[in-house]
Amino acid sequence: MLFEVPHRAVLSQVSFLLPCDSNDAEAINGIAAPVSRLPQPWRSGLACFEALLESADVVLAHNAAFDRQWFGHGPLPAIHKPWLCSMEDLRWPAERQLRANPSVRDLALAYGVPVWAAHRALTDCIYLAQVFERCDELEQLLAQGLEPRRLYRARVSYEERHRAREAGFRWNDPVSGAWTRRLSEREVQRLSFPVVPLEEPCSA
């Protein structure tokens, strides 16, 4: 889906299935591998997707770390544009009462967007687009989400672990035995407990 931020408008969208021999995620997305191999113009769909990608400034996904791993393999093109994660990089307004890393479903419902299906790419994109349409501070959220980030470990005791959890840090993910989260320098300054960097800063 190609979304234009200033006008809060969906400009174009496309959905198609890539043929596959098996689908380990069938129980989640409901796509049977034989269905993916039925005759359909998937190459034309892929060409349309590549045209949308060429027009985009930023690639956004919910749980971008999962989605970006598939690009540059098989028929999917490599993506060299900035990635932005609507689950981890965007700090949604406190009045929406969302967890630090909300699901697409929870995010949609917090903005009054009805949820009628889940775990399909286009429906997830529709939910996100409708959230963006309702988000008055979208430009600020996106700009702050694109700030360089690095992985930090929270320096909290066992008794204080709730402070890290409430700040969106994850235990054992991706570092075993540690509370960690990717943060910008601005976000680090706002924390109420000390942290230590675990990697060099990088853009999305």
Where are these predicted regions, by residue range?
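Acidic, divalent-metal-coordinating active-site segment for phosphoryl/phosphodiester hydrolysis
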Residues: 122-133
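Extended, charge-rich low-complexity interaction segments
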Residues: 114-123, 202-204
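Conserved beta-strand -> loop -> alpha-helix junction used to position metal-binding or nucleic-acid-contacting
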Residues: 79-92
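Acidic two-metal-ion nuclease catalytic site recognized across multiple nuclease folds
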Residues: 131-204
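Conserved non-catalytic scaffold segment of RNase H-like nuclease domains
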Residues: 1-82, 101-119
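Catalytic phosphate/metal-binding cores of nucleic-acid and nucleotide-processing enzymes, i.e., regions
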Residues: 96
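Active-site catalytic microenvironments for nucleophilic, acid-base chemistry
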Residues: 74, 92, 131-135
